[in-house]
């Protein structure tokens, strides 16, 4: 039974071809939304605060400031509702979790941009 679950998870992971990103990067996540009978794509852009889990259950938490208010949104990375992930800007941080961004707004909520080569590992 455990083998069957592992095989299904591996099959799901092989389908996905996600762009490599890390905590501190600013990414744009496009998701499928069903409004009434219509299906449309909604884009959410924010700074990656945390990546949790692994395998098919891996999640990412994004932080963004809009209209002076901070908001967070979590996404399952391997969900069929996610259309695509695009890295907008690379961030330079020294932490694995950026929860200190929660109460910050304006310039204090910014992450320095990383300029230079980045290794291919996650």
UniProtKB/Swiss-Prot annotation:
GO cellular component: cytosolic large ribosomal subunit
Keyword Ribonucleoprotein in record: yes
InterPro entries for this protein: Ribosomal_bL19, Ribosomal_bL19_CS, Ribosomal_bL19_sf, Translation_prot_SH3-like_sf
Entries under Pfam families matching the protein: Ribosomal_L19
Single GO biological process annotation from the record: translation
Superkingdom per UniProt: Bacteria
UniProt-recorded Gene Ontology molecular function terms: structural constituent of ribosome
Key words, A-Z: Ribonucleoprotein, Ribosomal protein
Family recorded in the similarity comment: Belongs to the bacterial ribosomal protein bL19 family.
Function: This protein is located at the 30S-50S ribosomal subunit interface and may play a role in the structure and function of the aminoacyl-tRNA binding site.
Protein name: Large ribosomal subunit protein bL19
Organism, scientific name: Chlamydia felis (strain Fe/C-56) (Chlamydophila felis)
Lineage of the species this protein comes from: Bacteria, Pseudomonadati, Chlamydiota, Chlamydiia, Chlamydiales
